Regions:
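Pseudouridine synthase
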Residues: 39, 140-187
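RNA pseudouridine synthases
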Residues: 1-130, 136-139, 161, 182-184
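Beta-strand-rich interaction surfaces with strong enrichment in secreted/lumenal proteins
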Residues: 134-135, 146
Length: 187
């Protein structure tokens, strides 16, 4: 466990809380569910905070964003059904390399899961995957892309953007380079 993970206090992640749900801002670098490489996960921290927490959805370990945790089985079923029926609109923001002045597109490329959680585009063995993508804002050497996954495959947005030579900055697993704040100047 890194020093950074030791310092995370679950209560400080909470954006909103009701009798049924806890809404948190998940930081990058921590798994939502159990992870063989780390004992600290969002769900283990939530179990110390409330009696019966259940994740209504998940975010990849290195992804930050809003995460909803149900406090009881009925609340979980209610929101899980909304996710299953795709009535929840999910939009991810990703800073990618280069100026991507493109029209909105649908990336339809099948994804195959390899060992150790990495994925690749594979037209023979992959499972169908679709992501809607459009540019949001332009910087000097980067573009903020707005991404809406139609399917929910592991690392879907990361591999789809990388497959079009638009790797997410900092995502070294799929070809992204480290980002320095000085390079995020407005175009």
């Amino acid at each position: 466990m890194t020093e950074r993970m030791k310092k995370i206090i679950f209560k400080n992640l909470i954006i909103s809380e009701t009798e049924d749900y806890i809404i948190i801002n998940k930081p990058p670098g921590i798994s939502s569910l159990h992870d063989w490489s780390s004992e600290t996960t969002i769900i283990t921290m939530a179990k110390e905070y409330t009696e019966d927490p259940q994740l209504c959805h998940r975010l990849d370990k290195d992804t930050s964003g809003i995460l909803v945790i149900a406090k009881n089985p009925e609340a979980y079923r209610n929101l899980a059904m909304q996710f299953e029926k795709r009535s929840v609109e999910k939009i991810y923001h990703a800073v990618v390399e280069g100026i991507q002045d493109i029209e909105p597109i649908a990336i339809d490329r099948p994804i195959y899961t390899m060992s150790k959680g990495k994925v690749r585009i594979d037209f023979q063995q992959g499972k169908p995957a679709s992501t809607l993508v459009k540019p949001g804002e332009f910087f000097k050497k980067h573009t903020l892309m707005l991404c809406k996954p139609v399917t929910g495959r592991t690392h879907q947005i990361r591999i789809h953007l990388s497959s079009l030579e638009m790797p997410i900055v900092g995502d070294e697993m799929y070809g992204g380079k480290q980002l320095y704040l000085s390079s995020l100047k407005k175009k």
